[in-house]
């Protein structure tokens, strides 16, 4: 054996060996229970950073552990490779997005292999390749056939920097999720998916082992509200419509309506605005288009509006109500119209005060004196000024008013959602083309399945301005209508890249299958994913879309399950000097340099040790150096000659106890994904073994068995050095095909425990006692302790509490 450990040489040797042997190839023919381990695949930005490693390494440790526990583990890998950065790079560097992307794939593939993960490279997927996006287009057609894909003109989020449309989920605090530029609104013909059809299912996480923060974010994003849809009579000579509908969660306040507010985008605004108010309304609409939805909804921003000149009639009391427009109302929520009840809504109260609109109290506490309100009353109370409902508790009034409205045909109970349909079309080149054509005779026509994929053309000119480069490629645009054979034009928008990542986990089950998006037999074997790991930032984008996609495919009969991921785990982040790593701060840690310096296993072990996986930790170069030194000590523990002297029964017992306690702890901690304490336990064990080795009181056989067990527990954390040590022990290749060690509960028990003695909860004594001490013996020992007796003088013990093996608490008075 080598005297000095050379991590780079050893790691390359075993990585090459594992690859040549296809050691980590997962087969559906295995008699073992399956385990599908998946980490969110990386975007092809060009280089892996330490955050990628932090996502992959602990997940790989757990996958390796499951393999040793007898599971047939699949851990696939791939690349999310469509998207805006590639197109921006094409414009900036005058390079084709395909070339830029595939160069990045090649580099990142090399980097991923240095992690030493048990990736099954036979299952690699790259979403920008035609053999993948052919099936992305196929899914679009299936969604279209099912009525879940549609085209409509709608106000959309626009990023002026990216020159692209954004889905609602991609706007964060009024800014673009990618570049943080403030977004604006535009009216465009767009393609949408009816994700709202699945609103109730998407807020239900029954049976899933997901973090509560993620399920809460998804429930809040769906935003389910119970209320009523109420129609107000409209008598306007310039409008064909005879009513305006509003959604309200407070039907009990219907008698207090003193104004109505429409969203600036409401289709009736233009029709009902009187000539004398048109200039002011037009100016207000123009101004509102410069505001983001976040700004419009902000509670800090002053609410304003403009009068249209038109009135509606509140049918429950015959009152004429002025119709205003205000940008704090969104067309995308409810009906795009709200009833103003200033007496019982804080926002409406401020609006009414500003524009001198009436305030009518219709809910009041029992002691209400009839004086004008100085602020909106939003608590429960009794209905007044409410016709037949006077004296009714408003909690009952909600239901009664709904029934009353329904009886007269003026309204109905309804449920509303904050969730909007998924906007999936993008005016960019580097994405999967939407497989639709436009024929003057036949209208919108889907591309036949036999003609898929609709390929991206290679010869395109990239330009800014917000229009797809495909629009100017005549060879792509001009085509033949599949129905009538006449001239037609292709859709030039491409799909949101989240479309590609909404099903990639299905493709991993059979990536080479060409008769469909996946082999149904293999899909049934592997799905759903048993453990999915990745960042919490994907809660209302990727994770949300993937769940919708899975449920839609289930309803179409393509798959037979409704949830893609059984268990979800979100890792924390690695910071440097208490700051998130970024190029601008100059604190980015490059894994390539670290591997060259200390080797992969040291980086792996340090990342797992740096802090709880769900919290992350502070990067420290000295900590990494310390981890490297520890692995060298482990190497020396195995490779330096051991010559036993006379075996000691006491030393043998101590060895077995320490070993079995460590097996138990590491097993339980890995199951809980607590990798930092796993590494700490391995360190403690190596220190204990080093001390026992010095005594030379362990038999050669027991020492050999102990080293084998240690290597097995080290294998998920540091797979390369563990494989090398295993081979050096003369064991059968590969360590990663062995069985995880088990512990004996009896052997793991301590012979001696430290018993804490308290009096009224205060520590008074620590005693070393036999591990098997009985409750009676523990209590008697505590009461008779010389250091405890002074605290009992003149006092009467009320009770003595015993926590087995840990403490005795004497309660006195």
Swiss-Prot record:
Keywords: Aminoacyl-tRNA synthetase, ATP-binding, Cytoplasm, Ligase, Nucleotide-binding, Protein biosynthesis
EC number: 6.1.1.4
A GO cellular-component term linked to this record: cytosol
Catalytic activity: tRNA(Leu) + L-leucine + ATP = L-leucyl-tRNA(Leu) + AMP + diphosphate
Pfam family, one: tRNA-synt_1g
Positions bound to ATP: 583
Compartments it resides in: Cytoplasm
Motif ('KMSKS' region): 580-584
Keyword Nucleus among record annotations: no
Record-level Gene Ontology MF annotations: aminoacyl-tRNA deacylase activity; ATP binding; leucine-tRNA ligase activity
Example GO biological process: leucyl-tRNA aminoacylation
Main location: cytoplasm
Annotated coiled-coil segments of the chain: none
Intervals of motif 'HIGH' region: 42-52
Claim: Transmembrane helix is one of the keywords in the record: no
Record-stated family: Belongs to the class-I aminoacyl-tRNA synthetase family.
Protein name: Leucine--tRNA ligase
